[in-house]
Every structure is written in structure tokens, then in C-alpha cells.
């Protein structure tokens, strides 16, 4: 059996960790966070008094927030977030653009689904059902 390659690098993980720390700090939050295993389909969990309260999917982009009118994410991430919502765990998508950071609640929204994805890696599994989230729906954390 051939396994799909892992594309996340240690540099990616450092950027994602920094983004989560900035996000928590922006709320003057006294919460901890932990990296989640891959089977959870989210990157981190936020922990308040040893209780998991939120799962966070983090994306660090190399473009400005205004470069596109929507943000695309794998439908499987949104489906997973709705499942977690059923057991009381909120899920957010946190995006660090080059000029701003924003987040959106993944559990309580309905967005357009289309076929899309990236083509630069030559991986046929990168083309899949994706969800288009309007950039206007993101809550802005602040300038970075």
C-alpha cells in the first residue's frame, strides 16, 4: 500500500504554532493549546481548565487577505467540524495572511461547495470537493 506524502514541514508547523499563540494572545486568553494527531483533521485544540473547548485548523498564506474573494478549504475539514460540533466541540478556521489574521466558525455556516484544489504538487488527491468561505465572513484579529 502506498501512503500519501506528508506535505507539512517543520517550518509550516512553527508558523502555525505562532499563529495560534497570537490568536490566543489577542483575546488575553488564559487557555492552553496542543497539537492534534492527524486523524482529528484539525491542527490544534484549545484547552481551558483541562477541558477541550475548541479545535483550530490553521492556515498560513503567502498572499494578502484581499487577494481572493473566498477562502477554499477541503470539504472533509468542514464535515469533520460539523461532527465535532455534534459533541459540543467548536471548530474554527484561523488564517494568517501576509497582512492580517482572521478566523471563522466552521461549525455553524453553510457555504458553496465546488471541485477545486491545488495543481502544483502533481498529487491527484489535491483536486477534491472544496468549500468556498467568503473572506467577508472572517473575524479579523488584527494587523501583523
Please report, for each region that a protein language model flagged, where it lies by residue:
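Acidic-basic catalytic patches of nuclease active cores, encompassing PD-(D/E)XK
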Residues: 1-36
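Conserved catalytic cores of phosphodiester-cleaving nucleases, focusing on short active-site segments
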Residues: 44-64
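Alpha-helix C-cap/termination motif
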Residues: 26, 47-49, 84-87
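Mg2+/Mn2+-dependent nuclease catalytic core
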Residues: 61-84
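Nucleic-acid nuclease catalytic cores
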Residues: 82-110
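Beta-rich catalytic cores
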Residues: 40
Amino acid at each position: 500500500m502506498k501512503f500519501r506524502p506528508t506535505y507539512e514541514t517543520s517550518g509550516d508547523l512553527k508558523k502555525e504554532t505562532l499563529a495560534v499563540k497570537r490568536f490566543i494572545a489577542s483575546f488575553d486568553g488564559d487557555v492552553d493549546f496542543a497539537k492534534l494527531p492527524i486523524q482529528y483533521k484539525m491542527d490544534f485544540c484549545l484547552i481551558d481548565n483541562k477541558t477541550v473547548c475548541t479545535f483550530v485548523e490553521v492556515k498560513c498564506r503567502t498572499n494578502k487577505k484581499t487577494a481572493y474573494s473566498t477562502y477554499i478549504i477541503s470539504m472533509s475539514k468542514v464535515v469533520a467540524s460539523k461532527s465535532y460540533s455534534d459533541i459540543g466541540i467548536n471548530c474554527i478556521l484561523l488564517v494568517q495572511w501576509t497582512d492580517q489574521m482572521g478566523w471563522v466558525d466552521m461549525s455553524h455556516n453553510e457555504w458553496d461547495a465546488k471541485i477545486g484544489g491545488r495543481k502544483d504538487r502533481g498529487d491527484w488527491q489535491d483536486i477534491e470537493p472544496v468549500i468556498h468561505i467568503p473572506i467577508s465572513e472572517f473575524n479579523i484579529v488584527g494587523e501583523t
